[in-house]
């Protein structure tokens, strides 16, 4: 395997939370936003947008932290067998950690774009996507000689946040509907603290256990075990910090 395979493997791994969270949010949010906007219910649209922001962040940020902190055990469990050597797993994990930084941005795009689509504006997001694509290509080509194959992953991550920046700036014209408010910012801060707490716990756990994972079977079992530990740690910190509860997620993902 070479650079293309490494990037492909990392892409498959971070696409899992992106697909589950991003698509679910988009499917639920767009019809609800459209309904409120058509009815002239600005407050309802604002609440729907705020709720989608909180839920998407609550699901994507801990996933990004985990992919950044413990990418190698996750990659090893999935890919380190057959023709994929340890050096390949390390390279895939490196790309995965870079992509993890952009994961919240990719999911935020799924939250922000429905604001435009609900107003029947598809041209503006398309124009922003073109700008982000130019940034992506420019960085990938410009950094290739300096950084090698990881330039592609870095370019993808940077361009994802550039796209979010364009969408946030453009959404100002939607007024209060596109704002999360002080309460929303406090909730996002508590979610971030819970995710960082989870990340610290996973880092410590992996530091103690990694040297004992020396067989294929243990590698396969170790990755899912860390995922389960991360879920439990995040749930604990989220509960202690009053960040978000399963009931909050259920209400947010339920169509009204």
Task: State where each predicted segment sits.
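Membrane-embedded alpha-helical bundles of multi-pass transporters/translocases
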Residues: 1-256
């Amino acid at each position: 395997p070479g650079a293309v395979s490494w990037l492909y493997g990392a892409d498959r791994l971070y696409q899992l939370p992106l697909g589950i969270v991003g698509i679910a949010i988009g499917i639920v949010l767009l019809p609800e936003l459209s309904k409120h906007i058509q009815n002239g219910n600005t407050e309802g649209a604002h609440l729907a947008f705020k709720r989608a922001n909180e839920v998407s962040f609550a699901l994507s940020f801990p996933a990004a932290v985990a992919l950044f902190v413990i990418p190698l055990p996750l990659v090893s469990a999935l890919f380190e067998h057959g023709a994929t050597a340890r050096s390949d797993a390390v390279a895939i994990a490196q790309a995965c950690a870079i992509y993890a930084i952009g994961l919240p941005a990719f999911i935020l795009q799924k939250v922000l774009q429905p604001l435009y689509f609900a107003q029947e504006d598809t041209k503006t997001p398309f124009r922003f996507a073109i700008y982000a694509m130019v940034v992506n290509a420019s960085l990938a080509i410009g950094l290739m000689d300096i950084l090698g194959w990881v330039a592609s992953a870095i370019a993808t991550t940077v361009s994802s946040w550039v796209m979010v920046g364009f969408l946030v700036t453009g959404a100002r014209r939607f007024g209060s509907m596109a704002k999360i408010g002080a309460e929303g910012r406090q909730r996002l801060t508590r979610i971030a603290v819970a995710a960082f707490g989870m990340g610290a716990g996973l880092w410590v756990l992996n530091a103690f256990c990694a040297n004992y994972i020396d067989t294929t079977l243990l590698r396969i079992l170790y990755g899912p075990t860390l995922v389960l530990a991360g879920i439990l740690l995040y749930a604990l910190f989220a509960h202690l910090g009053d960040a978000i509860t399963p009931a909050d997620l259920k209400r947010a993902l339920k169509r009204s």
